[in-house]
């Protein structure tokens, strides 16, 4: 219970920091925001907004907020093309070199057992929801920054959002396309109880 409360407080803190960041940018004239400051601003906005969805997703089944049909991969060939064209496999390799390279961290997603496939399915949904929600909100907030005249920050926001949130969505959908081949159609609805 304490962990859930703390993580919700972290998310609320990030909401307030996001609002403060946007208020700060509105008080700065576009020509005063340097290249480096624009990049830092874009990075912080992406980090804060992604965290708003990540922290609750660590302690609540946020993936269930979207309907089951959303998570079904209906056109795996198109997904494979997007995966290849965007070179998402390099993004995956970068993740494996970092945090997910440790066996302990990988086992959180999939432990190699048959029951682990259901857990993996659940984790892909959790991850995809967090990144997809952040992707959409950051996209919307970027137009506030654009309206303030911070065009360089606007461009950096989209670049970071694309790599930091769109790539993970594609990666999780790629994982789920493989899961769908392993699980009967209805079994992917029976997700582990995560509280």
Per-region residue spans from a language model:
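Membrane-proximal soluble regions of multi-pass membrane proteins
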Residues: 62-120, 178-181, 185-195
């Amino acid at each position: 219970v304490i962990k859930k409360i703390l993580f919700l407080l972290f998310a609320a803190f990030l909401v307030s920091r996001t609002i403060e960041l946007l208020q700060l940018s509105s008080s700065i004239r576009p020509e005063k925001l340097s290249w480096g400051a624009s990049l830092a601003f874009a990075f912080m906005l992406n980090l804060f907004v992604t965290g708003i969805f990540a922290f609750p997703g660590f302690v609540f089944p946020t993936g269930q907020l979207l309907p089951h049909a959303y998570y079904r991969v209906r056109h795996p060939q198109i997904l494979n093309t997007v995966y290849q064209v965007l070179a998402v496999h390099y993004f995956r390799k970068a993740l494996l070199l970092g945090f997910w390279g440790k066996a302990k961290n990988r086992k959180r997603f999939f432990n190699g057992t048959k029951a682990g496939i259901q857990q993996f399915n659940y984790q892909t949904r959790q991850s995809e929801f967090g990144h997809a929600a952040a992707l959409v909100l950051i996209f919307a907030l970027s137009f506030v920054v654009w309206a303030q005249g911070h065009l360089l920050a606007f461009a950096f926001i989209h670049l970071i959002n694309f790599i930091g949130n769109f790539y993970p969505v594609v990666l999780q959908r790629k994982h789920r396309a493989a899961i769908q081949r392993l699980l009967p159609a209805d079994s992917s609805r029976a997700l582990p109880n995560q509280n």
